[in-house]
Amino acid sequence: DHLVEIRDLDFAYEDRLILDGISLQIPRGKVVAIMGGSGCGKTTLLRLIGGQLRPSRGEVVVDGQAVQRLHNDELYALRRRMGMLFQFGALFTDISVFDNVAYQMREHTNLPEELIRDMVLMKLNAVGLRGAHHLMPAELSGGMARRVALARAIALDPMLIMYDEPFAGLDPISLGVIGHLI
């Protein structure tokens, strides 16, 4: 059973072909790394899987759904079941670490605030930042901000988590925490 299937996929930015004839299958429950040089299309592939881009040709299927054929409401429903940690996973700068992680829970569920509180603290604890819940993003180091972004990505226990350059620019402690969680 495959969580993600990519079939004969092409993608171009205007006339510049980025991905040409890509096919791959990602099984459920496995960690899969897509590796390659700068500019070879790794981030583009993740954006295609998440439905942020549409292929020029071919098909992206996630959990049995052809992503490029989904209407907006169906695509949003699928994305709620995905966690994405992109290289520049920006946090909302005007709300606390706690509220950054709680955002998806408040936006996409009807959970009571007490349960959201417990879940947020559990996710922050998982990334080693339980004591940082009251801080604002401007008060965080780069590694701490990436760990908060990871806590946000895993907030709703997604079926699929996509990481883009998850270790770029991390200090040794953050690298160890994120590597262990992946």
Descriptions of predicted regions:
Residues 35-37:
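The feature captures the beta-strand-to-loop junction immediately N-terminal to the Walker
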Residues 50:
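Helix-to-loop junction immediately C-terminal to a conserved catalytic motif
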Residues 65-66, 113-132:
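Conserved ABC ATPase "signature" region
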Residues 67-83, 113:
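ABC ATPase NBD coupling module
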Residues 136-140, 144:
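Conserved ABC ATPase signature
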Residues 157:
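Conserved catalytic motifs of ABC-family nucleotide-binding domains
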Residues 161-164:
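Catalytic Walker B motif of ABC-type/P-loop ATPase nucleotide-binding domains
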